[in-house]
Amino acid sequence: MVTLTPSSASTPKTSFDFMKNNNSHSSLYVSSSSYLSSKEDALVTTKKLMEPSKTLNMSINPKQEEFGDEKKMVKKAPEDPEIGVFGAEKYFNGDMDSDQGSSVLSLTNPEVERTVVDSKQSAKKSTGTPSVRSESSWNSQSVLLQNKLVNSCNSSFKEKKNSNGQIQKVTNNKKSFLANLGCKCACSDGDSVDVEEKTSVKRSADPNISVITMRSSADMNTELIKIQKQEELSQRKSLEVFGSPVAIEKKSSVVQKKLPLPPWKSRTEEDDTKSEGSDSSSDLFEIEGLTGNPKPFLTRQGSDPASPTCYAPSEVSVEWSIVTASAADFSVMSECATSPVRRNRPTQIPRIPITAKSAPQRRKSSSSSGGNGFLMSCKSHKSVMVSGDLDRRSSMNKTQPSYVPRFPMETTKPKSFETRRRISNSSISHTQSSLLYSQ
């Protein structure tokens, strides 16, 4: 028996029966006391001595404590049956130690329980070689790890001091959680995480690259289409489209020449081109007739020196010319006197060679002289001139009719100017008298 006397006189004396308490505890937990080490017992006893008011029950009458202990024994007796299957597995795995130690220390103090459990865990984890439990539960990768990783996990436990000066070990939750799960592989390094992020970025960038390539190809196609449209617009605006029709006809003729055609088609096309060329030439003749002289077949030729005017000579025209000449005091017969005269033939109207041709003759001449039907419009005028020259040559080769003097009184030999004047005056007087009689 130990008696403690407090300093204050007001508090009564209290007696603590350590022996009975110890005996009662020892009777309850005989099986569990064998597993406790001597160091743990020493820690428990020191804690009991340091904090008696918290750990031990204070009582004035020791009989009440005995009755309470007996009740506890009666209540906890059915809790100790025979060891079952799960209990045996826990016993062989080493879990019974931690459970029984915690149950014993729960009666004393939670702080003591924490320190004891932490000391056991640190003693187990301080060893470099893993136990059977760890080898069976951890993954295959944890067996191949080095001792440095284990030491790094053990270094995660940090020691802190309480206000009372006690040493308390506090673990880092994140690292302890990874250590319990056995994720001590090379994936947990920061570099490996960065590498995985890079690979994930690459994987995520691959579809973007494919999308970019698809977009770039689509953009190239659209650009090509735009370039083609611009070229078409430039061709439409160029001279090739809005140029002269002659160049277009030339190109079409060249293309038609290059394309080979069967003989029956070529013949029909030649006939068509000839007919088109002849029609175009006849149209040109009509246009020239409208724009130029109204009667081109009555025009004066270069080989006809006797026709002073553009009309055919007749009696009425001769008389009218004499009247006008007398009125203007001009002798028209001076020109006629120079022409050769034959007395044998009577007065005749000189025959004028007709250069005008019929429509089929003109078509033949134009088709023979033209060559290609496409260029007939350019050579139509020249072809007419050529035909006129041929007619002139033919008329020159033939015997030209002798021109008869209009007035038989004239002689072949030229006379002096005075005699010519007299003859002209006399002829004018005769014509005037004849006109008066006719009226």
Swiss-Prot record:
Disulfide bonds: none
Record's compositionally biased regions (Polar residues): 1-14, 100-109, 118-139
Annotated localization: Cell membrane
PTM remark: Phosphorylated on Ser and to a lower extent on Thr by phytochromes. Phosphorylation is stimulated twofold by red light.
Compositional bias of kind Basic and acidic residues: 63-79, 412-421
An example Gene Ontology biological process: red or far-red light signaling pathway
Tissue and organ distribution: Expressed in young seedlings in both darkness and light. Moderate in leaves and very low in roots and flowers. Expressed in the elongation zone of the root and hypocotyl.
Keywords for the protein's UniProt record, in alphabetical order: Cell membrane, Membrane, Phosphoprotein, Phytochrome signaling pathway
Assembly behavior: Interacts with PKS2, RPT3, PHOT1, PHOT2 and the C-termini of both phytochromes A (phyA) and B (phyB). Binds both spectral forms of phytochrome, Pr and Pfr.
Stated name of the protein: Protein PHYTOCHROME KINASE SUBSTRATE 1
Organism the protein comes from: Arabidopsis thaliana (Mouse-ear cress)
Gene label: PKS1
